[in-house]
Amino acid sequence: MIGTLIWRIKEATAVFLGKKKTQREQPKQNFPERNLKNLTPFKTQDEKLNQFLSGSSIEFIFSEFNEERVNAGGANLSHQLRLDPSLSTLKKYFPDAKYTVYSDFDLKIKGVNLKKVEKPVLQDKKTLRRHFYHLADYYKFKGMLESEADISISIDSDMFVLNENVYSLIYLTEKFGFCVPNSSAQSMNFEVETSLDTSPVTDESKGFGTTCNITPMTLSKKSQSGKMFYEKCCEIMEKEPSRASIVMWKAAWESGVYPYFLPKEFCVCRGSEGLGNEVILHVGHPSVAEFYNIKI
């Protein structure tokens, strides 16, 4: 925590003195406006893909705790349906998938299966400042483990699926068993020093393991390694709740199994705008929504 504060003070001082910008300047773009009102159903003409999709059961899992919608990325999504823009943009490409939300309140949305959690875990740790984030992350892991689908995908509600390349996510999961998105945070040392809600990495890696993001995450029903990994994530989150990326590294170290890393194109966050070949945008970051002309 002290390291995080020191780093943030140094960064703020550099910006104040004009030695550093808060983020790199982006070139002017000319993307067409996209919003939830101009979505049109998509039907692929790829027969091989159609056969693969029709022969596979797919479930998308959301985890929403606390009735007040709070977005850590900074966007104001309170006027949106609780699971949008993720839900609507996913349905454009996966109209026949199953959609499930884990929640501690009566979150009723048409076409979405509610799994209300009457007695959530971590009740002895409710005083922690990011308690609801810990709950949400725990049930993202848990939801995939409880899914009966061939492919289960946990995803945050503030994502915008941009194009049909999202189907690659299914093939990658089928091939590698379980996937998590890449992160711009570099090593675990950098993550611990610069992020909120972290805990020390004390294993022999000395913090030089790679860090990951948390949306989207995937699991194939056939992957025993994936199940082992996410079970360990649940176990560690219950025992020592902290930022999900920290939990996931500790789970990987203790279990000895590691997921396939999705490229940043599957979770374009603040600072990665304009990288090219984008698939899913993290529009909970206002700069991402603005860059790609997403109106939410």
Language-model segments: residues:
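A conserved donor-nucleotide-binding helix/loop in the catalytic core
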Residues: R82-P85, L122-I155, N163-Y167, C212, ...
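A structural signal for short, well-ordered beta-strand segments and their strand-loop junctions
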Residues: T100-S103, I153-D156, V161, F178-P181, ...
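Catalytic core and acceptor-binding pocket of nucleotide-sugar-dependent glycosyltransferases
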Residues: G207-N293
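Conserved donor-nucleotide/metal-binding helix-loop-beta segment in metal-dependent transferases, i.e.
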Residues: N163-S195
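N-terminal anchoring/stem segment of glycosyltransferases
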Residues: L5-K126, H282-I296
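A structural signal for short coil/turn segments at secondary-structure junctions
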Residues: Y93-F94, S147-E148, T173-E174, S255-G256
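Short, flexible, basic/aromatic active-site loop/helix in glycosyltransferases
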Residues: S195-F208
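Short, charged, surface-exposed secondary-structure boundary motifs
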Residues: Q123-H131, S187-E193, F291-Y292
